[in-house]
Amino acid sequence: MPQTVCVLGGGVAGLSAAQELAERGFHVHIYERKPVMGGKARSIPVPGSALPDHKPLPGEHGFRFFPGFYKHVIDTMRRIPYGAHGNAFDNLAVATRILLARAGQTEITWVARCPSSLEDLRVFLMELFTPLGVPPEELAYFVSRLLIVATSCPERRLMEFEKIAWWDFIAAPRMSKAYQVYLGEGLTRSLVAMRAEESSTRTVGITQLQLLYGLISPDRVFDRLLTGPTSDVWIDPWTQYLRSLGVEFHPGTRVAGIEVDGARVTGITVNDGPRIEADFYIAALPVEVMASLVTDSLKRAAPSIANLDKLQTRWMNGIQFYLAHDVPVVNGHAIYLDSPWALTSISQRQFWTNFDFSQFGNGSVKGILSVDISEWQQPGVIYGKPAQECTAEELEAEVWAQLKQHLNEGGATTLNDADLLSWFLDPDIEFPNPSAATNAEPLLINTAGSFQYRPEAQIELENLFLASDYVRTYTDIACMEAANEAARRAVNCVLVASNSTAPPALLWPLEEPAFLKPLQELDRIRFGLGLPHHLASR
C-alpha cells in the first residue's frame, strides 16, 4: 500500500512536491486555503469582465518570467503533458530584449554578447551600463564590485558577503545620485525586487550576475515568458496531470495548527474540517504563514524553525492594463529606472500567439500591459503618497502616470489615455480602510545576515519537511525556481525517511562561466588564509 504524504500549500512548491512524489508512487493530498491551485503564479479571472459567450479578462498577481538560470522549474514543465503530444515547456517563448526606460531620456535596450575571459566580462559590463550616464570612475568601481562577487569562492560569499548590505558593498552612500538611483536602487529593486540598503550582498550580487550571465552565455537564454495566461498554459494542465497520477486536492482548506509528539508530527488541524493524518508531511507554505504556525512546542521539537518570524517580507504585486491597441514596448521586459515605485512590465500579446484576444472580455481588448510594483513605501508622482497609502484608483493613476513618464518621450506617445479600456489590481492588495492597503501575499526578501534564520528542507522532525522559497537552496532568492528546488529537497527527505528505492529528485547548482573557476579557486585559498579578495585593493 502506498505511503501517504500531506502537502500543505498548493502553490508552485506544493504542486512541484506533489509531482515528484506522485511520479514515485506516493499517495498525495494537497491542502490549499484558496479555492484554486497555483498560489502567486495562478491566473485570476477579472470579475464581471466577460460577455456571456466570452472568457473573463486574465488578471494575475504578477507576470511570470523564467530567467535563463531556471533549471528546476523547466525540468518540471517538461514532464507536464500539454495538448496531444506536447508539454508545458512548449508554452515558453524566448524574450530577446530587456528595455531600460528612463523618464524623459533615451531608452536603453540590452542584447546578448559572449565574453570568454574576465577582461571580456569587465568590458561587457562597462558597455552594458555606460548608457545610464553614471560617471565613468564610479561605473568602473561598480563593475569591479560585481567582478569580486563573480570571482569569489562560496565560502567568502556565505561567511563574508552574506553579512553585508549590497548598498554598502557597492559604496553607494559616497557615490553620485545617478549611481545610487540606477545602479544601487533601480537595478536591485527591478531585477531582484529587493532594497539595496537592506539586502544581502551574497543574494543580490549572485542573482544579478545570474541574470546577466543569460546575456553572455551562448547556450543560455536571457529570459522566457509564457505564451498565454499562466493557468491556461501551465497551472491547469499541471493539476490535470497530477489528478491523473492520483493526487487529491482539497481547496478552501486553511491550516490551523501542526500537532507534534516528540520528534514526530501526529496530525494537522484545519479550520472547518476534520483533523488530517498522513505518514509524512510537507509544509509548502509562505514564510509568514508557516511562522504563524510555529508554536512553542514546535520550536522545542524543531529549533531550526524557531526564528522564521525574523525573516522579512516586502510587497511585490501587479496591475494589468487592458488596451484598445496593442503596445509591444519591447520583446521582453521593460524596467522603469526612474519610477519611484520600481515598475517593471511585459506587453503580453506579442507572446500569446495562440490565444484569440477577441474571445476575452467583450472582445475589444487588443493588448495587455502587465506591470509589477516592487516599491510600496516611496511617494508617487501624482499624489505624493506611498503605494501602501493609496486607494486602488490612486494606485492605477500613479502607475499609469509613471509608465507614461518613461515611454512617452521625445514627442512619441506610446501610451495613450484613450486606449486604456480597463485595469485590474492584484486582489491580494486589500483595502480595509481608505487610507491604507494590506497585502495578503507578500514576498520574502533576504536581508543581510538572514541566512542564519533560514532552515534546510530537513528539520529536526522525522516526518515533516519544508518546501518553500525561504528554505536554503542553490537558487537563494524568493521565486518559483527556489520554491521548486525546495520542493525537490523536501521530496528527497521523504524518500530517505520512507526507505524508498525510487531515484531522488534532481538538483542543479547555479552555473557560472567556466573562465571564472580558477579565480574562484584562488580566492578559496586566500579566504582560507584570512586574506581579502585579490581584486579588493585595486
Where are these regions (language model features)?
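N-terminal Rossmann-like FAD-binding beta1-loop-alpha1 element of flavoenzymes
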Residues: 3-30
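Dinucleotide-binding Rossmann-like beta1-alpha1 core, especially the glycine-rich loop
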Residues: 51-142
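Active-site/ligand-binding neighborhood in enzyme catalytic cores
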Residues: 142-257, 261
